[in-house]
């Protein structure tokens, strides 16, 4: 099972990725992890990527695609893989297709922007313990205080409304076109299969729909 999981930040991709990888016995592959592993292993591609990153540059799509091909040739990908956060752009998707990397399924976890803003901007964290609360869905016993220590809770920079809205706008301009790309490819060639899963409701409900789509 070779899967791409798409969805905005806060859509719940991480949770669904965990269930998919467990069910099918496939690794979750993110470009960040892949780059770090290649750099650590000191492979030729890893060293090339390291020199680019050390100079403050962005790793080229060509290099990323070659890293992907190297990674999915490893034994743990024999039964497939799940791409998380890749491809991000149309050129990456086209390069992946042109490199002959076959995909079985593209799954989009779709959640309305306002719901995502509510989900993320309501998060509060107790820095010392890592305990996470939500002002609406999982509030602390005393507003703004950690249940155990009574210490102040904080809102992470990433969870501030303006940051969330900026990340969503980047997602819509850059990654949303991928949804159209794969829908079109699926309609024209029959592969990969494309599924749109509404990411609202209980985790169990969303997981059941996601796994049913992949069966």
From Swiss-Prot:
Species this chain originates from: Ectopseudomonas mendocina (strain ymp)
Binding site for AMP: 31, 36, 57-59, 85-88, 92, 156, 167
Single GO cellular component term: cytoplasm
Region of interest: NMP: 30-59
Residues that, per the record, bind ATP: 10-15, 123, 132-133, 201
Protein name: Adenylate kinase
Tree of life domain: Bacteria
Single biological process term from Gene Ontology: AMP salvage
Catalytic activity: AMP + ATP = 2 ADP
Stretches for region LID: 122-159
């Amino acid at each position: 099972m070779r899967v791409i999981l798409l969805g905005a930040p806060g859509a719940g991709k991480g949770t669904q990725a965990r269930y998919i990888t467990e069910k099918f016995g496939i690794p979750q592959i993110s470009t960040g992890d892949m780059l770090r592993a290649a750099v650590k292993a000191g492979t030729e591609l890893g060293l090339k990527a390291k020199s680019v990153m050390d100079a403050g540059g962005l790793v080229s799509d060509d290099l990323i695609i070659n890293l992907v091909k190297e990674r999915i040739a490893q034994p743990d990908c024999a039964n497939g893989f799940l791409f998380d956060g890749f491809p991000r752009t149309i050129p990456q998707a086209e390069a992946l297709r042109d490199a002959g990397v076959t995909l079985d399924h593209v799954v989009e976890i779709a959640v309305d922007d306002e719901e995502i803003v509510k989900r993320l901007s309501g998060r509060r964290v107790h820095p010392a313990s890592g305990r996470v609360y939500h002002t609406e869905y999982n509030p602390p016993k005393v507003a703004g205080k950690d249940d155990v220590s009574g210490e102040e809770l904080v809102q992470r920079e990433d969870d501030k409304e303006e940051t969330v809205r900026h990340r969503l706008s980047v997602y819509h301009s850059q990654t949303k076109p991928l949804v159209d790309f794969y829908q079109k490819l699926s309609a024209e060639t029959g592969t990969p299969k494309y599924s749109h899963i509404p990411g609202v409701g209980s985790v169990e409900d969303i997981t059941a729909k996601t796994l049913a789509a992949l069966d």
